[in-house]
Amino acid sequence: MHWGLCPRGPGAAAVAAAGSFWGPARLPSRLGCLGMTRRLVVRSVAGADSPQSSSKGGRYRDTVLLPQTSFPMKLLGRQQSDMELEIQQKCGFSELYSWQRERKVKTEFCLHDGPPYANGDPHVGHALNKILKDIANRFHMMRGSKVHFVPGWDCHGLPIETKVLSELGVDAQSLSAMEIREKARSFAQAAIEKQKSAFVRWGVMADWNNCYYTFDPKYEAKQLRVFYQMYEKGLVYRSYKPVYWSPSSRTALAEAELEYNPEHVSRSIYVRFPLLRPPPKLESLTDASSPVSVLVWTTQPWTIPANQAICYMPEAKYAVVKCSASGHLYILAEDKIAPVASALETTFDVVAAFSGVDLEGGTCSHPLTPDKVSPLLPATHVTMAKGTGLVHTAPAHGMEDYSVASQHSLPMDCLVDEGGMFTDAAGPELQNKAVLKEGTDVVIKMLQATKNVLKEENIVHSYPCDWRTKTPVLIRASKQWFVNITDIKAAAKESLKTVKFIPGAALNSMTDMLDRRPYWCISRQRVWGVPIPVFHHKTKDEYLINSQTTEHIIKLVEQHGSDVWWTLPAEQLLPAEVLAQAGGPGALEYAPGQDILDIWFDSGTSWSCVLQDTQQRADLYLEGKDQLGGWFQSSLLTSVATRSKAPFRTVMVHGFTLGEKGEKMSKSLGNVINPDTIISGGKDHSKEPPYGADILRWWIAESNVFTEVTIGPSVLSAARDDISKLRNTLRFLLGNLTGFNPETDSVPVKNMYVIDQYMLHLIQDFATKITDSYKQYDFGKVVRLLKAFYTRELSSFYFSIVKDRLYCENEKDPKRRSCQTALAEILDVLVRAFAPILPHLAEEVFQHIPYVTEPKSVFRTGWINTSSIWKKPGLEEAVESACAMRDSFLGSIPGKNAAEYEVIIVIEPGLLFEIMEMLQAEETSSTSQLNELMMASQTTLLAQEPRERTAGDIELTGTFVINLEGGDIREESSYKVIVVPTAREKCPRCWKHTSETADALCPRCAEVIGAK
């Protein structure tokens, strides 16, 4: 226990010698119960009287030491929220981060904050993420580490631009670049302030005075330096490739910027491509009188005009079939004959079968342009999952298609512009038509006119959409800047071998995503972001970038911010020596490029700005599962590319927040829960009560965050009930420590009651498990351990046993002080155990501890500190053997008051009897430690059957197996419990049935009153 008091003296429990005054110091190393274990949830004993349970105290009320504390049992309405604000102020929440940074400690813990997007109000997803991080940080800080946690915000990009333009009701073309940037910056700054205020209110400890922002000039400059380092190594290049393209946003998108609509409806068609030149090996199967067509299926008819080839699977089996309805001959995969015939509502007769490799050398005529040749080509991406086993290939509109085109030098012309419209190159019938709308209609009609469409139907499938505009995207070839992932991938995967993933399956997910990613497009055609520092020749397809130009721009950006790219003339963006070589001020042949860096590159280089040392790795990255393909991956790739190491040692991945029934939260469903409403309550407190931040934090810690996390009124109400029970436990502890000073009143462990020593043993084991769970970031297990301990071990078990000793013994009696010594240690361990999760409650308790005279902050007093001498496995078994007998007794009198019965325990001579003698030296006692455990009027311990038995008594039997010295000695002992109604009267002071007459005090109470 270390509440900021001076070190404990020799009388304190933690430094006292082991042993006990009640018997030999050595206990059996292992005791066991055959067929029976102690029930942690003690049976409720109806009518179990205590002096506290009646409003009528009688004439002895003032002699009973009832709990005294100002710690409230409940905080009603806004009291919880108001108390938390008061605690934050009083206990210095805002100064805690700087205080711990100034400590002279050797270890440091760095949690690198993944930047939330600065485009809206704080939501429960933010709460889940930030509170998980805070729990981890507070634990490591209390354990003695100097925590490094700098919050950040992702401030650039399309989502903010989209929101700004939407609020203004204009499109990007009607505003200048600087107008958009200024409004976007203001929007982001406002969102940051809202979010920051909420995070502070949730109790998040962080370096709030030195947050990082991706629009900060110094951050932008460091990002550009990483970009150029990668460019210099040949890892960044410009190329014409197909990328995900958003017509609504008029920019390229990364895969992480896509959302998939599972209910998207596409128009699919079966199209035939007339065989122009048969493959050499199949010439004998075809003749001019029976023309053959290759049959393909596509869900994107608009790409047919851009077709350059048809791909097949070389190792698959194919066939020439004859359609029974039309008599036409078609080539398709053998495995697809039946499903395609069914789809076309016809039958096929197989004319010939052959291997896919036999298709080599064949060509088809384009179904819209007969004189255009589409060769048959082998490809590895062809599957038999859907379609015909033959794939229409448009290199400008597919990643795999592009790969095939690169191998075979096919044209890659793109017929679609930035707005998703057909260009004039597509022909007058298609020009200026939206490819995903009327453009598709026209293409299908054109194919029908040439009689090359066999069937058209709608298909519902998952389709990618722009994550902000929610509209469908397409794949479109354009000149973009890319990161060469192929050259980094092996090193990135190797670096992950030194990284711990929580849960472990997240590693496989991340490596799978890396394997599936062919390249990373890092350029965007927008203005709110960091410019790619490249100058393009005005008339040639050339660009200018070198160390001189980049370093010059980096210095300008560091001093003035990235606005300079749009505000300064090109002549000032180039260093003088380069400017002279590029035509001079009056005849400059280059203009600044119009592309900005992808926001994933923006945030993915945060390690270069935030981690204090360029070689430093963060101890923990903790984000949602969507970041496995987002920030985790971009951070890994940029760090490995420039430093040859992963930026993190541990990666923890959590799920998303959902409504109470597992449904996605949305305004239309009316199930969006605002964290501020959770904390402060809604307009109607009867429907939306104020819970406070700690209940929000408890819900998060308790949830299985590695899957989807549900939230709603019932789970919040359950969390409130949990904390209410915890408050009652804490109130009991605080109330019974009044008048106790650990420095002067603690009882040495060897002199403590057995049950009190047993509780020290339990809390040492509890503390070890709690610490291990925090180390593993298994906060759900922490909560489960806490709930089991304070509800079962404390409230239901220990407190029910020791109330009489606390309330009715003399204030300074060693027996009472023994219990208070245990209570003080329990309180110390318990509060520290939940402090990282419930910081406000921990500080509130700290303010009410009677022997802490100048409370400041529990977080400044360290982690749990237990003593090795508390660990006594033999003692644990001794108590549990007595508890097994106690459970037998209580189970025999359901619904009745245990104090109205006497217990006779009969045990044959042996080890079990000797153990019970340690708890009760005399034959019969109403004040022994054994009787305290039994909660009976009195307990009698015998080695043989009593000479006389009472009619109507209850007899119970059981057997124990006792293991000594690690199992070297094994002894089985049987016992008998006889339950007899007591003939004694209830004492008017302690209410135990131990008095001779109804108006007389029991001997113990008479002695206590007499001493006073």
UniProtKB/Swiss-Prot annotation:
EC number of the protein: 6.1.1.5
Annotated GO MF terms: aminoacyl-tRNA deacylase activity; ATP binding; isoleucine-tRNA ligase activity; tRNA binding
Keywords of this entry: Acetylation, Aminoacyl-tRNA synthetase, ATP-binding, Ligase, Mitochondrion, Nucleotide-binding, Protein biosynthesis, Transit peptide
GO cellular component, one term: mitochondrion
Cellular compartment(s): Mitochondrion matrix
Domain of life: Eukaryota
Renumbered ranges of motif 'HIGH' region: 116-126
Family listed: Belongs to the class-I aminoacyl-tRNA synthetase family.
Name recorded for this polypeptide: Isoleucine--tRNA ligase, mitochondrial
Gene: Iars2
